[in-house]
A protein has these predicted regions:
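Short, well-ordered surface patches within globular domains
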Residues: 34-126, 164, 170-175
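Bacterial N-terminal signal peptides that target proteins for export
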Residues: 3-14
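A well-ordered secondary-structure block
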Residues: 100-104, 113-198
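Sec-dependent signal peptide cleavage junction
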Residues: 23-37
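Short, solvent-exposed loop/edge segments of extracellular or virion-exposed proteins
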Residues: 229-237
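Ser/Thr/Gly/Pro-rich low-complexity, disordered linker/stalk segments of secreted
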Residues: 198-223, 227, 244
Length: 257
């Protein structure tokens, strides 16, 4: 079966190179080699899953409202109206995909994952197997309503309404949404699928969380530096049996966007 994929990016205030400040070197599993050409990193993000789940109701409200459920045709003259759309089911397995992807786009804002693979490879990693799927991503929207208003793309033409068409796609039956705050920016991900995997409720994660084992392709790393605090100094002399606390050191990786 041919699988559809959508590459939709809301770019806002992204004219910068993302800097990954990793956890202290004393933290187990901080940075390690993965497969050839990739590296595993761990980062701390603050999840906002209560806000993320608020977007879910907004999407279904849009699908139910006949005055909202439309998009421009390719000619930008006529509209397609999406009648009798069924509400999407909130899928907690898809939410796990979206949460992982939200952390990943904080490092590399793209539908391509930091390890160089397509976004949908994250589905099977979380037990989601869909024939039709799509992803919407957004950055620097501090609230659920601000994100959704941008994703609606009310004033865009056909080429600019990809996110809108994803939300109104009759093939989709499930959605999961992720939201993280990292280095001063809010990152949001909406994952859509034509299958429902898990509907059992889970408590929303609104905590600062360590996300482990994010793979980054070596080709995406533009610089790699060990930062040593001044209290340790640039030169260390040790005697046999002596120990030195290096927990203040960390690795600073610059990742191309």
């Amino acid at each position: 079966m041919r699988k559809t994929k959508t590459h939709n990016v809301l770019r806002r205030l992204l004219a910068f190179v993302l800097i990954v400040s990793l956890l202290p070197l004393g933290y187990a599993g901080n940075v390690m080699a993965a497969t050839t050409g990739t590296r595993n990193v761990s980062i701390q993000v603050t999840y906002g899953q209560t806000d993320a789940r608020n977007v879910y109701g907004m999407i279904n409200s849009m699908r139910r409202n006949s005055s909202d459920a439309w998009y421009w045709d390719a000619n930008n003259y006529t509209k397609t109206y999406c009648n009798n759309l069924q509400p999407l089911t909130y899928d907690y397995a898809l939410e796990q995909v979206a949460m992982k992807r939200a952390a990943e786009i904080a490092l590399s804002y793209s539908h391509t994952r930091p390890n160089g693979t397509n976004y949908y490879t994250a589905y099977s990693e979380n037990g989601v197997y869909a024939g039709v799927y799509a992803e919407n991503i957004g950055v620097n929207y501090s609230s659920a309503s601000a994100l959704h208003n941008a994703m609606r793309e009310d004033n865009a033409n056909y080429s600019g309404q990809e996110q809108r068409r994803n939300m109104l796609n009759s093939q989709f039956t499930a959605v999961g949404i992720g939201h993280v705050y990292y280095n001063g920016y809010h990152y949001w991900v909406e994952e859509f699928a034509n299958t429902v995997t898990r509907t059992s409720y889970t408590t929303p994660n609104n905590q600062t969380t360590t996300v482990n084992n994010i793979q980054i392709a070596e080709s995406n790393i533009t610089s790699d530096q060990i930062v040593v605090p001044s209290s340790i100094g640039n030169y260390i002399q040790m005697s046999a049996g002596q120990t030195i606390d290096l927990s203040g050191c960390y690795e600073n990786i610059k990742v191309s966007n």
